[in-house]
């Protein structure tokens, strides 16, 4: 599913031809991608001119049967049925559908829809065959600012919520209700991306100053690898990290990207940089410290792939497939409004 400024497109991906395992080039398509449907909401302005309303958020369930998107006028929920070449789309009415949302997500088993209204908090809806029931309304006191992140763990047990003031709160499902679980230590810079590992349940968070941390959700503490992540040295890095994903085949690999590059970290390939040494200090009093022993610094190897200009999305689709979405810079200028004309001293 692709979200544009004023509409949503649902595509079925194409299939590639079979190649040898040692092949390292572009693979020709055996079946082309196919656009299944386009969703949008048309409104009429004061001059009776019809136009499409902007899309603020959208999400699709893992089983592909539920689609939700929101505009400034409210949220819309659809149930999708596909049989061979036939596609059926039914609009489902639900409580709070007139409340616009800034974020939304489905649980891993596609049984619940969780939305974040503009007014704050969370609304949890139970999804049944043809009925949607409001299960729970959550007020999150730990969130101080606009919610920027709303993610569900792959196991479906944990719900991650983060705001623009670096507050990250985790909720857990208990007796069909979401209850507070823990809160990460607040950092002085806002988070730009976060993702939870599907197997280890390690939460990886990146901040606007390029700091990266790894948090063990089960133990509610940072992992020892966080100290090594804090020593990452990105050369010629000018953009914040946009998203984080993991290799489903290897638990030790972390993949994240910014506007122009993809970075791959293998946690098992940390090395000792003997050229750089950290000095251990021993506190003898609250005001005084003496120099200790110089020890080599353990660093993490980062493999960088630079072949993109404006990379907006990157993630794994299946065991051996991943998708990268790149935006053409010329397309950005085409959507900008015309330049503002101003007359100064008789000249325009």
Question: Language-model features: where?
Answer:
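Long, low-complexity intrinsically disordered regions enriched in Ser/Thr/Pro/Gly
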Residues: 1-348
């Amino acid at each position: 599913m692709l979200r544009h400024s004023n509409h949503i497109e649902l595509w079925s991906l194409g299939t590639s031809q079979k190649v040898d395992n040692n092949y390292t080039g572009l693979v020709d398509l055996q079946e082309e991608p196919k656009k299944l449907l386009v969703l949008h909401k048309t409104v009429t302005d004061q001059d009776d001119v019809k136009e499409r309303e902007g899309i603020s958020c959208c999400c699709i369930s893992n089983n592909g049967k539920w689609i939700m998107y929101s505009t400034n006028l409210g949220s819309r929920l659809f149930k999708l049925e596909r049989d061979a070449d036939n596609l059926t789309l039914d609009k489902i009415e639900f409580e709070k559908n007139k409340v616009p949302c800034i974020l939304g997500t489905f649980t891993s088993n596609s049984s619940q829809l969780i939305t974040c209204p503009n007014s704050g908090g969370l609304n949890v809806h139970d999804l049944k065959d043809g009925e949607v029931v409001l299960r729970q309304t959550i007020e999150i006191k730990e969130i101080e600012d606009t919610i920027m992140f709303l993610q569900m763990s792959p196991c479906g047990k944990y719900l991650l919520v983060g705001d623009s003031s670096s507050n990250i709160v985790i909720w857990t499902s208990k007796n069909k209700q979401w209850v507070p679980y823990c809160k990460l230590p607040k950092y002085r810079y806002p988070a730009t991306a976060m993702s939870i590992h599907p197997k280890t349940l390690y939460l990886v968070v990146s901040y606007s100053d390029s700091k990266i941390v790894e948090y063990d959700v089960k133990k509610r503490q940072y992992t020892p690898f966080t100290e090594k992540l804090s020593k990452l040295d990105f050369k010629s890095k000018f953009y914040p990290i946009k998203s984080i994903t993991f290799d489903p085949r290897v638990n030790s690999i972390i993949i994240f990207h910014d506007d122009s590059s993809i970075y791959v970290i293998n946690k098992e390939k940390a090395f000792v940089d003997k050229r750089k040494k950290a000095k251990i200090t021993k506190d003898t009093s609250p005001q005084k410290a003496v120099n200790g022993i110089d020890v080599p610094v353990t660093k993490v190897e980062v493999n960088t792939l630079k072949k993109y200009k404006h990379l907006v999305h990157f993630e794994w689709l299946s065991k051996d497939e991943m998708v990268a979405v790149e935006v053409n810079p010329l397309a950005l200028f085409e959507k900008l409004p015309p330049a503002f004309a101003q007359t100064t001293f008789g000249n325009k």
